[in-house]
Amino acid sequence: MGKEQQLYYGKHGTPQKYDPAFRGPIYNRGCTDIICCVFLFLAIVGYVAVGIIAWTHGDPRKVIYPTDSRGQFCGQKGTKNENKPFLFYFNIVKCASPLVLLEFQCPTPQICVEKCPSRYLTYLNAHASEDFEYYKQYCLPGFQKNKGVAEVLRDGDCPAVLIPSKPFAQRCFPAVHAHKGILMVGNETTYEDGLGSRKNITELVEGAKKASGILEARQLAMRIFEDYTVSWYWIIIGLIIAMVLSLLFIILLRFLAGIMVWVMIVMVILVLGYGILHCYMEYARLRGEAGSDVSLVDLGFQTDFRVYLHLRQTWVAFMIILSIVEVIIILLLIFLRKRILIAIALIKEASRAVGYVMCSLLYPLVTFFLLCLCIAYWASTAIFLSTSNEAVYKIFNETSCPVAGKTCNPETFPSSNESRLCPGAHCQFAFYGGESTYHRALLGLQIFNVFMFFWLANFVLALGQVTLAGAFASYYWAMNKPDDLPAFPLFSAFGRALRYHTGSLAFGSLLLAIVQVIRVILEYLDQRLKAAENKFAKFLMSCLKCCFWCLEKFIKFLNRNAYIMIAIYGTNFCTSARNAFFLLMRNIIRVAVLDKVTDFLFLLGKLLIVGSVGILAFFFFTHRIRIVQDTAPSLNYYWVPVVTVVIGSYLIAHGFFSVYGMCVDTLFLCFLEDLERNDGTPERPYFMSLTLKKILNKTNKRQAEA
């Protein structure tokens, strides 16, 4: 070993020494990072305890049903409000009060009703007429007409006026509509407030602005929901096609890796080329059509996305984007053509490994199931925590009152001193909260819930990586493949990971979870600072977000390679991470080229599958396939099922290719270890396949002599 090589190895660690007893993943190993395993166990116990406490105190009905002024649910079965699903506000104009922002509740009485008002009436006109029976259903429960008009309105027993309303999110909002740009309720632009004066409709709009502000969004959501109801089975068929294509692609890759890779590259180029041609054809077709030359800036945001497809500028933008992607891919292929040949050989070797461990293709289902459990537990715990507050009642008054905002009891309030001090004040439900230790700790429990979700989700992913790495490492280090391959390598690797390395997996996933929680906090702070004018704060926030994004990517890369070393040697996390990092640094050129070129080829495979299924879905849902033209459902937005199929296809393809990616990474690290451990002599033969030896001009001397 030369002096320069000694200095180089000293800088990036020392290579693994030759061990004649080494034949792949070590079976006689001990537990690693035990203290982290203990911490994970305690954290899970605490997480379960938090879930039990949340389920004990929580009430998801608070999310589903609106509540009246006494905190009673509207429309809930088994209660007196079972047939009253809608919440009615006595004076919705009060919802524009600043108190709404402070207390998250309108300072006006609210009751549950069977249906929203459909008539315009005032209490002044209705109390002495036959309309009173209709009006009475919008008064407080149990109201009797034994008071004067002034007393009834002062005590808030009945609303001063009924306005035609429509339900939204189980709440009654004024049925405001626009006629020639003028806001109206019914045929009127003003309304009588029931107290002898007339007010402008805009005051109602201000009070109900949250509902009117999301009216278009609600219509969009309803149309999207309708599209899902009539196209869900076709979406499932599209996802099944994506799964079959992914599986077929991987099976063919085992036997025709070289041809498939080049066919894949050509197909991606052709798909992008067709996309460019289609954009140009649409651009040419719209020439001369009325309104097609309007710019995207002038058009602004539209909830009906089909409007954008009638603009020539939209298709020009699509064509430019696709052309740039096409040129970038072609240039990369030209400059990396030699390295692609080496990557193809690595993929062929990975194909053989996957072929001998076929059950590895099903392991993503295990990861998916465990991740679903993590997500379900996190989501349910979050809902129960957010609904575990107690009903808090506050004193509300339309005029100034010294006790306004104080906590009160609705049962005893009518006879209390506060009621006599402020005539006309109401003790009504304000929000859900509490003064106990548990309620004060709710924010901390929610943060803990998020943290544990990240930790457990990363642990599940780490378990999958170690399991696959152990199985594929067993394949590589088998001298006579597949005869020396152990029985059930995947199950053996899974058992070793759980039995010996739970602590190491917990350590690696903990580091990643901490960084991810910090990124979530930074995103939250960034949203809060968007309205700020402090440019330095915005710059600092952008720098922090960028730094932690890079840190997360680096930790993911380091963890992935550390897990491979753990699967092979059974060392603890820090030792494995250090050895993997130094091994990669000693072979940085191979890492930068071979590994990344392989990742690029896998990305092209995903694009081919997603593009093929996406184009098929596009032609089907736009009724452009004549054979099934009458079978395709009629939709409000054809892009709803198309986008769903595209996203689902990508996730399915990613699941299959993730197994392949882990196989390539594992074989690559084993290959680097093989080059450093062995020299091809009869005492230290190479374990790599004949194909890899041929590419690298390496031979075992006994074979060469033969």
UniProtKB/Swiss-Prot annotation:
Membrane topology value: Multi-pass membrane protein
GO BP term (any one): transmembrane transport
GO CC terms, sorted: membrane; mitochondrial outer membrane; plasma membrane
MF annotations from Gene Ontology: antiporter activity; choline transmembrane transporter activity; ethanolamine transmembrane transporter activity; transmembrane transporter activity
Record function comment: Choline/H+ antiporter, mainly in mitochodria. Also acts as a low-affinity ethanolamine/H+ antiporter, regulating the supply of extracellular ethanolamine (Etn) for the CDP-Etn pathway, redistribute intracellular Etn and balance the CDP-Cho and CDP-Etn arms of the Kennedy pathway.
Transmembrane region(s): 34-54, 233-253, 257-277, 316-336, 365-385, 458-480, 505-525, 564-584, 600-620, 639-659
Topology Extracellular: residue spans: 55-232, 278-315, 386-457, 526-563, 621-638
Lineage top rank: taxon: Eukaryota
Highest classification ranks of the organism: Eukaryota, Metazoa, Chordata, Craniata, Vertebrata
Annotated Pfam families: Choline_transpo
Quaternary structure note: Interacts with COCH.
Keywords from the UniProt entry: Antiport, Cell membrane, Glycoprotein, Membrane, Mitochondrion, Mitochondrion outer membrane, Phosphoprotein, Transmembrane, Transmembrane helix, Transport
Catalysed reaction equations from the record: choline(out) + n H(+)(in) = choline(in) + n H(+)(out); ethanolamine(out) + n H(+)(in) = ethanolamine(in) + n H(+)(out)
Protein name as catalogued: Choline transporter-like protein 2
PANTHER family reported for this sequence: CHOLINE TRANSPORTER-LIKE (SLC FAMILY 44) (PTHR12385), CHOLINE TRANSPORTER-LIKE PROTEIN 2 (PTHR12385:SF34)
PTM entry text: N-glycosylated.
Record topology, Cytoplasmic segments: 1-33, 254-256, 337-364, 481-504, 585-599, 660-706
Modified positions (Phosphothreonine) in chain numbering: 14
Family classification: Belongs to the CTL (choline transporter-like) family.
Subcellular location: Cell membrane; Mitochondrion outer membrane
Positions glycosylated per UniProt: 187, 200, 397, 417
Classification via InterPro entries: Choline_transptr-like (IPR007603)
